[in-house]
Amino acid sequence: LDGLPMNTTYNNGMEWEMVPVEKIARIEVVRGAGSSLYGGRAVGAVVNIITKDNPEKKGASVNAVVSYGSNNTWKKALYADARVNKKLSFGVGYENRKSDGFKGYYYTGSASKDTGTIKPDKELPQLSSGKYILGGRGEKVWENENISANIKYDFDEDRSLKYTFIHTESEYRYQNPWTTIYKDGKPVFSGSVDVGNGQIVKPSIGTYLGYDGRKESDLHTLSYNDNKNKT
């Protein structure tokens, strides 16, 4: 982001939640050996997301965005930027993104020879591999909050010093576990299920259970730019 690494030190993954989407000016892709200028994790290529700069002329601007999508997906954002004088400018921003999610995971099981104790109301759906679809964890509900601020001091037309702070909070959980197995109209999540031909599947209730997650991240950057002495 603006030439600075966004990968985590834990697993080298990308902190996408920290990217202030409404502030993106352009995206650059650096391929080949030149990407090594960005550090040891940048071998092969670099994707550099460039954000919009603060206004050049004295004054202030405010940008608000509200959008809605499928699965009750919302995005709300508010950004304000201002230039105090010829040398000093700053910006603040807030983004909230959340969704009720969708059923993106399903649990399958292979049949084995045995006598089942549960005779389902109807045949279970089956994949071409022969495995049976037994259900899933349900929808993955998530919410991200992103707060950002920056202050920039221009020494002259070529040299500037900029401090940027980004704070992100992310939460997710699974809800409404579902099953394809019903007995007398009631959902079945465990047991020995008769699928016919002397075969059974044995779903386990633990497989249907999702998990909760929460993550907080802070990013502080101090960058000095000297256009006059670039090489």
Task: Identify the residue ranges that each predicted region occupies.
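N-terminal periplasmic accessory domains that precede
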Residues: M14-P20, R41-V65, W74-Y79
